[in-house]
C-alpha cells in the first residue's frame, strides 16, 4: 500500500493577508470519476483533518474532495476563535466556493456538519450548488446554543454577557458572536426556514436519533418548507450530535454520507446504492499523513505555534 500523503495543501490570501487553508483530495485512480466535486464544511470546533476519513471514503468512490478551516476558528486558517461569528463562517465558505469556481470547477456538492450546516442553509439559495448534504445540522441556533451551553445567553442584554462562552472547550467571544447573531438574523428557526424555502438545490439531511442539541421535528419542519420538495431526511441510528463518539458511529456516518453523495451525483435522493469502502489501514495512513502535514504547516507558521 502507498503510504505517501495524497492531500494537496492550498492557501488563499484574503482580508488583507489573512490565510484561509484548503486541502484537496483527488479521486482515487482506477475508479470512475463522479460528475461533482465535493466541498466539506467541518462542524464547530472541528478541523478539516478531522474529516480525513470522510474525504478518503469519497475519494475512494471517485469524488474530487476539498475541505477548509474557517477563519477565526480552530485549525490552520488565520484568526482566533474568540472572534468567530456565524458571518465569518459564511464568508469563509463562500470564499472557498468562489475559489473553486475560478479553478474551473462547475459542479459542486456541499457537505456540512453541525453549525456549518446552518451556514449552508443561509447560502443555499445564493450559491449554484449541485446538492447539499447535512449531518446533525443546526436549524435553530438559539435553541442549540442553549442546549450546548446550559443557558440561553441570547436572552441577556449585551452588557450582561460574560466575556466568553465555553462551547465544547473553546472560548467564543460572547459579545461579537451574539451581536452578529442578532444583526444578521442567525438565531431563530424562522430565519432558517426563510432561507431554504425557495431553494431548488436537492437536499439530504441526516439527523441523529440521540442528538440532544438538534430537534428532529424542527429539521422535518425545515424540509417541509422547501417548496420544491426535492429533499429527504435520514436518521443516523445510535448516534448523538458527536458523530465521532465511537468507531461504529463514525463508520456509519462515513458510509451514509458517501452513499448520499453517490446517489445525489446521479440525481437521486435514495441512498440504497453500492459503494466502495476503504479498508482500516488505508484510513489510518490517511489520518496519520494529514496530522504530519498539519504539523509541518504549523511549524512553518510561527503564530500557530
Swiss-Prot record:
Q: Where is the active site?
A: 114, 211, 241
Q: Name one GO biological process term.
A: fatty acid metabolic process
S-S pairs: none
Q: Which UniProt keywords apply?
A: Acyltransferase, Luminescence, Transferase
- Annotated metabolic or biological route of this protein: Lipid metabolism; fatty acid reduction for biolumincescence
Q: Give a short account of what the protein does.
A: Acyl transferase is part of the fatty acid reductase system required for aldehyde biosynthesis; it produces fatty acids for the luminescent reaction.
What protein does this entry describe? Acyl transferase
Gene label: luxD
Amino acid at each position: 500500500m502507498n503510504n505517501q500523503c495524497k492531500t494537496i495543501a492550498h492557501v488563499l490570501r484574503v482580508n488583507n493577508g489573512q490565510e484561509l487553508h484548503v486541502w484537496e483530495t483527488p479521486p482515487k485512480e482506477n475508479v470512475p470519476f463522479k460528475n461533482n466535486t465535493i466541498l466539506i464544511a467541518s462542524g464547530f470546533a472541528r478541523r478539516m483533518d478531522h474529516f480525513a476519513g470522510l474525504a478518503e471514503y469519497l475519494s475512494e468512490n471517485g469524488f474530487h474532495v476539498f475541505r477548509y478551516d474557517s477563519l477565526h476558528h480552530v485549525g490552520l486558517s488565520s484568526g482566533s476563535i474568540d472572534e468567530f461569528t456565524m458571518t465569518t463562517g459564511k464568508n469563509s465558505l463562500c470564499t472557498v466556493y468562489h475559489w473553486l469556481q475560478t479553478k474551473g470547477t462547475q459542479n459542486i456538492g456541499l457537505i456540512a456538519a453541525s453549525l456549518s450546516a446552518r451556514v449552508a442553509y443561509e447560502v443555499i439559495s445564493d450559491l449554484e450548488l449541485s446538492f447539499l448534504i447535512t449531518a446533525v445540522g443546526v436549524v435553530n441556533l438559539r435553541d442549540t446554543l442553549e442546549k450546548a451551553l446550559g443557558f440561553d445567553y441570547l436572552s441577556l442584554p449585551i452588557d450582561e454577557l460574560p466575556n466568553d462562552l465555553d462551547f465544547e472547550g473553546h472560548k467564543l467571544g460572547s459579545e461579537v458572536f451574539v451581536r452578529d447573531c442578532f444583526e444578521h438574523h442567525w438565531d431563530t428557526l424562522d430565519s432558517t426556514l426563510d432561507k431554504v424555502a425557495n431553494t431548488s438545490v436537492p437536499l439530504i439531511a441526516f439527523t441523529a436519533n440521540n442528538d440532544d442539541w438538534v430537534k428532529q421535528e424542527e429539521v422535518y419542519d425545515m424540509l417541509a418548507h422547501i417548496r420544491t420538495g426535492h429533499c429527504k431526511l435520514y436518521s443516523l441510528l445510535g448516534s448523538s450530535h458527536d458523530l465521532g463518539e465511537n468507531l461504529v458511529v463514525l463508520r456509519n456516518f462515513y458510509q451514509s454520507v458517501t452513499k448520499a453523495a453517490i446517489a445525489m451525483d446521479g440525481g437521486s435522493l435514495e441512498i440504497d446504492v453500492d459503494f466502495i469502502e476503504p479498508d482500516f489501514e488505508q484510513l489510518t495512513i490517511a489520518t496519520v499523513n494529514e496530522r504530519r502535514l498539519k504539523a509541518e504547516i504549523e511549524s512553518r507558521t510561527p503564530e500557530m505555534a
